[in-house]
Amino acid sequence: SIAQLDSGGAAQLVNALDAHDSGESVETIEFIDLVPSSAQGASVGLTSHTSTHIVSAGTDGRVIAWDLKAGKGRGEARHEAAVTKLIVHPFTPLFSTSSMDHRVRTWDVRTMQNIGTQHGFTDGVLDLAVGADDGITQGAESGGIGAYVDKSQFKGYKFVGAGDEGVALVFRLL
């Protein structure tokens, strides 16, 4: 436990998940649920009810889903350049990644299939935030002034990518 570590106790190493390319770093890692859940109850974090699966991403461009019970990878996906951020869509099997390849991608951890790629950045995407799509929009649909709520636009999730060129772009997962 953290308390044991704080008081000088030792942590027990359980496993080493070693599949990213040698010499490259793992940049981001998150717990993820394989089965969507809206049930209330104990959570292991802000995005997952279970602690049996994780997703890692690194500077090798690889995104790897891990089964912690089996101690091995269960699937892999790839960007063309270093992955800078991975964020799980809360309590779902979906996650999004940002990369130096100028793209934001959304994946399904069960199949590791890409279910969406967002373009528009002219440089690397350094950070990413995901939130529930509440239908609030500001931009082209509203003439760039004010915000409005259109309940027909509730799509599930929207996310914001922070680009190295000094711009943040907002996307809706359709």
Protein language model annotation of sequence segments:
Residues S1-E24, T28, S37-S43:
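Solenoidal tandem-repeat scaffolds enriched in leucines and small polar residues
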Residues A57-D60, T97-D101, A162-E165:
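Conserved strand-to-loop turn within each blade of WD40 beta-propeller repeats
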Residues I29-S51, L86-P93, S98, R110, ...:
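Loop/turn segments within WD40 beta-propeller blades
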Residues S1-D6, V63-D67, V104-D108, A168-R172:
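WD40-repeat beta-propellers
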Residues S37, R62-I64, K69-A70, R74, ...:
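Eukaryotic modular interaction domains in large regulatory/scaffold proteins
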